[in-house]
Amino acid sequence: MRLLEAAATHPAGAPAKQLAREAGLALPTAYHLLRTLNHEGYLRREKGVFVLGAATERLSAGAAEQNRRGMVADTLAHWCDLIGVPVYFAIYRDGEIDVVSVADTVGNPAVEEWADFRETGHAHAIGQCLLAQLDDEARRNHLDRHPVRSLTPNTVRDDRTLLRRLDALGRMSPVVEQQEYALGTVCAAIPVTVGTTAATMAISVPSSQAYRLKPATRLLQEETGKLLRTLAFSISI
């Protein structure tokens, strides 16, 4: 890594001896590492000097992804503390529901994923909010792969009923779900659309505290509006 850091300071390239000196490595060790880095594509030798190779882009992309995930996690943790409820962030990617990050506390635990979120989008607020943002063909395709099934006595019973509900919601309307995924839990989700990517922020509370859901959702909408740019970064995660 020290050799790569040294090479990065020389856009026009630097010879092996200079890189070894700047990295604080013995020349034989540096030669061995430089050959390896050149073979792996992290460095490229041109006219006697070493320059950064194409593979270093993967390193920077990985670091950028890690930073984005950290920003999302920090944002959700802040909202969890501020609102006093678990907070979820999910996107619809490659035809599947992807819960990117969840923030909760001991006093406000997240919903237990007792049935795979990806397969039960018809039953929870996250899935319903994401499906509402899709066009009719994409919704039907999703339901063909993940059919509606009962999880609780409150779960929607069939595709037709669900599709009517989604049509009535509209793409950018909040979704409230009352014990359809898990008994004892009520949830709300708000849509966050960036470009063509469907995304959602969601919260959950015990059904005994259902009165908290509406004010908590309103506060989440306000906070999401303030930090929409932060959420936009996470779409590429």
What are the residue ranges of the model-derived segments?
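Intrinsically disordered, low-complexity polar/acidic regions
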Residues: 151-152, 183
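Extended hydrophobic
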Residues: 158-226
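Cysteine/selenocysteine-centered motifs that mediate thiol-based redox chemistry or coordinate metal-sulfur cofactors
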Residues: 147, 225-237
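Amphipathic alpha-helical effector-binding/dimerization core
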Residues: 51-145
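N-terminal helix-turn-helix
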Residues: 1-66, 228-229, 233
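A structural signal for short hydrophobic beta-strand segments in well-ordered beta-sheet cores
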Residues: 42-45, 89-90, 192
